[in-house]
Amino acid sequence: PTESPWPKNAGLLFFHDTPERFFPSVQIDVVWFPEGAGGDRFEEQIFKGPLARMTREALGYIQRNFLRETVIKHPHRAEATRVWNFPYAAIEEALVNAVYHRSYEEREPIEVRISHEELVILSFPGPDRSIRLEDLQAGRAVSRRYRNRRIGEFLKELDMTEGRSTGIPKILKEMATNGSPVPLFET
């Protein structure tokens, strides 16, 4: 069989230096609200490029600039408790899921909104319609219908995802282990 002379969408998204030329708004916007979302100031950093590089760069930026560890000493024991304002493993899982499951037909970027109180990841159009919100919040978001199966295969090869519906349970576990509030999922 002859090979197709045209690149596949997943190939452009992972291997072209500027996939946003073909898919507008393929980017991750990280927005910092130092006064909260209702404040008058914000700072933004926009990440573009091949999906894996863009995702890793956004995660590194978030980790370097916004994650803080607090050490709590206890009077009657030698071990201190260490907690993070936002656990990195949960953020990593959530952002990779957003890249994996977003619609590349939508002309909206993935947006990470950060304030002192919360970190919100917006990705459109949200979870697949076959996943109920109640199941998502309970960590039972098991769907064998993937919006972007080929993207998932590439992310799996890059050790960025497992592709076995483990993302939401991992986010819930990491948040609980850190002593963080249960994350809120909305559709």
What do the predicted segments below correspond to?
Residues 1-7:
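Core subunits and conserved enzymes of cellular information-processing
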Residues 7-11, 15-56, 86-187:
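Conserved beta-strand-loop-beta-strand hairpin that lines the nucleotide-binding pocket
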Residues 42-44, 51-80:
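Helix-hairpin-helix/helix-loop-helix acidic hairpins
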Residues 81-85:
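Conserved mid-sequence domains
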